[in-house]
Amino acid sequence: MKMTRRAFVKANAAASAAAVAGITLPASAANLIVSSDETKIKWDKAPCRFCGTGCSVLVGTQNGRVVATQGDPEAPVNKGLNCIKGYFLSKIMYGKDRLQTPMLRMKNGEYNKEGDFAPVSWDQAFDVMAEKFKKALKEKGPTSVGMFGSGQWTVMEGYAASKMMKAGFRSNNIDPNARHCMASAVGGFMRTFGIDEPMGCYDDFEHADSFVLWGSNMAEMHPVLWTRITDRRLSHPHVKVNVLSTYYHRSFELADNGMIFEPQTDLAIANFIANYIIQNDAVNWDFVTKHTHFKRAETDIGYGLRDDNPLQMKAKHPNSGALHPMDFEQYKASVAEYTVEKASQMSGVSEEKLIEMAKQYADPKVKVMSLWTMGMNQHTRGVWMNSLVYNIHLLTGKISQPGNSPFSLTGQPSACGTAREVGTFSHRLPADMVVANPKHRAIAEKIWKLPDGTIPAKPGYHAVQQDRMLKDGKLNAYWVMCNNNMQAGPNINEERLPGYRNPENFIVCSDPYPTVTAQASDLILPTAMWVEKEGAYGNAERRTQAWYQQVKSQGDSKSDLWQLMEFSKRFKIEEVWGEDLLAQMPEYRGKTMYEVLFRNGQVDKFPLSEAQELNDDAKAQGFYLQKGLFEEYAAFGRGHGHDLAPYDVYHQVRGLRWPVVDGKETLWRFVEGSDPYVPEGEGFRFYGKPDGKANIIFAPFEPAPEEPDQEYDMWLCTGRVLEHWHTGTMTRRVPELYKAVPDALCFIHPDDAQKRGLRRGDEVLLESRRGEVRCRVETRGRNRPPVGLVFVPFFDARVLVNKLILDATDPLSKQTDYKKCPIKITKV
């Protein structure tokens, strides 16, 4: 779809006039298309490059550059709106320090790990890179090579990377940065329902009577979705908004019931609500009897630390995800100890506020939408917390219906579509399959035309484990793509930087800008961004969206997909597979990894003539690469509850929510009449489980691995702010966003500041047991922590706050807890 600037002026004028008159124009009337010769600006659609909301924008290009963006009025997600970051999308690709050519550490004309970065050709870059990967493979085998990817990869990039690692190099050591943000959500879905991703959709916002935010500052992190909650709340007086957080933020401004709780005690609060439902006879027995089982989680499971860490050694059942059967009476007895008095005493939230929220869940006439993001997922018991909230919805039957929706929000544009659905985690394959399951491996090997036994059965190193293995010298050739983990990951000083600078290791970073990660690497590959390539993303409501390339990449930068294709050409299949595999398929002898994986009659099935004129990746390979990868990937899910539409369809629509069966998207899963996989007469079927029943899982309160003491007497919570996204790689290069919020500040309660002799603007030293950073004090403003806690965002490369964070994870999901870390604060 192409539009001119004049079309936008007309559309906006018409829409404004209609609004004044109190009428609504159809989308087609507000999105006129006129002849492109009336202006040189061309317009086309693309999903936003930032968060997991999945807003659609209209991209204006002129003279080979993106010159403007605007909210897409035809998009059902954002309905023409953008947040402040979205309005400046046109500037993210044009930072003054945009990387234009590969850079290799050199000394005396050769690669040297202690050398300075010097520009090299792509051939030279890949020559050195291939040499290092081949050396590691030959000396230590497939487990010595790895990749750290991204929820910002396109679907096709993630699919190609996962296929290259797991089928080509035969290494499961690939993990996305979504491990840091969504792994606990995945774990909760799989344990409770046996299948990943939300059963509801954004339409729930217009149907709910009550909203409960469990650790999610939607006003800043998902602002477009927050406008829908705001509209619902202000337009319907009966609607209530409940906000749970460890500190006061902008979402509290709309809250009818705002609750500040002690870190980690959300576990007790969730169990109290379940107890309240039972004690007040609010259990939906018809639903519970037909559609659920009761289970008990194994307890005292540790904190995902190194095996020799004293905290880990104390655990009775380290890393255990075992579930034990129980009946309702046993479940009732288990939650009974979580009375309102106990929950209030533990959490610091008043009994009145807890009961007010619990009543909304218990009332069968009130439709409740629970929403959460990192506050629940970045948690050493994040999987438990996800399941505890599902328990509440399952006990009341408030699930898979308009307005009744437990909804896990995502933070990255394709954490769902790429990391989760494609399966770029170290333990996963596409469509919720896992490498540990021999039947799943056999399916993947058949689709990929591989010999039996190609895919290793053992899960690879997850994100935090990759850092540890780099440091220990067991992971030696490592490719970081589309993320800035040196700034975003935990425990930078002790566990990450030592591995990058380990002389045994060779670290590659693909990025558009010289990030902290790039500067710590040995080879930097300049990467094409966003609409400089064709791609597809999958958002938080299961909506897959595609876009065409609209401008050429800058300098000699290349897309991640191009880099994967070209690198795979550097390996003969004999260099990565053993004789046992080659003997099964001798026709592969002498071929490159590229030919075996990507010229297999499926990926290269669609001719270049089907691609748009501007598609550099397709032209480089001589076939419609993106379509071939997408269609091969889609074969995993079609007929198995993960159905995707044909690739070309996505370019004609503003996304479709899977499963897409017979051309129809699915709004609510697991419910008859909406989900084609639920048989007639069953009402509900949670078909991720063999018997179609979901698990109600009891898990108790367990403390955080570290808590404040006399020396480290404050909690530290990290996170984001409205104006910046993650580590600020893109947003800090947008002048307007940088000027709005140039620095990461230490938000602190005035009483804590006064106690330490601090005033607003003072520079302070924040110290944990792992490191220290300096920043300035803020006692006013949007974020207002309670006494005993500070909030510091992580977007600022000059304030590497994650140096302070313990690399403790949820032992089940392996996701890091960034929300609670003891520190001390002193004035500089």
From Swiss-Prot:
Residues bound to Mo-bis(molybdopterin guanine dinucleotide): 85, 152, 177, 181, 214-221, 245-249, 264-266, 374, 378, 484, 510-511, 533, 560, 718-727, 802, 819
Enzyme Commission no: 1.9.6.1
Domain 4Fe-4S Mo/W bis-MGD-type intervals: 41-97
Source organism, top-level taxon: Bacteria
Family annotation (SMART domains): Molybdop_Fe4S4
Record note on cofactor: Binds 1 [4Fe-4S] cluster. Binds 1 molybdenum-bis(molybdopterin guanine dinucleotide) (Mo-bis-MGD) cofactor per subunit.
CDD domains on file: MopB_CT_Nitrate-R-NapA-like (cd02791), MopB_Nitrate-R-NapA-like (cd02754)
Predominant place of localization: periplasm
PTM notes: Predicted to be exported by the Tat system. The position of the signal peptide cleavage has not been experimentally proven.
Subcellular locations according to the entry: Periplasm
InterPro entries membership: Asp_de-COase-like_dom_sf, CT_Nitrate-R-NapA-like, MoPterin_dinucl-bd_dom, Mopterin_OxRdtase, Mopterin_OxRdtase_4Fe-4S_dom, MopterinOxRdtase_cofactor_BS, Periplasm_NO3_reductase_lsu, Prok_molybdopt-oxidoreductase
Assigned keywords, A-Z: 4Fe-4S, Electron transport, Iron, Iron-sulfur, Metal-binding, Molybdenum, Nitrate assimilation, Oxidoreductase, Periplasm, Signal, Transport
UniProt: substrate binding residues: 794
Reaction catalysed by this enzyme: 2 Fe(II)-[cytochrome] + nitrate + 2 H(+) = 2 Fe(III)-[cytochrome] + nitrite + H2O
Cellular component, GO, one term: membrane
Signal peptide boundaries: 1-30
Cofactor(s) in the UniProt record: [4Fe-4S] cluster; Mo-bis(molybdopterin guanine dinucleotide)
Pfam families the UniProt entry points to: Molybdop_Fe4S4, Molybdopterin, Molydop_binding
GO biological process: cellular respiration; Mo-molybdopterin cofactor biosynthetic process; nitrate assimilation
Functional summary from the UniProt entry: Catalytic subunit of the periplasmic nitrate reductase complex NapAB. Receives electrons from NapB and catalyzes the reduction of nitrate to nitrite.
NCBIfam families: NAPA, PRK13532.1
Oligomer and partners: Component of the periplasmic nitrate reductase NapAB complex composed of NapA and NapB.
Protein family membership: Belongs to the prokaryotic molybdopterin-containing oxidoreductase family. NasA/NapA/NarB subfamily.
Protein known as: Periplasmic nitrate reductase 1
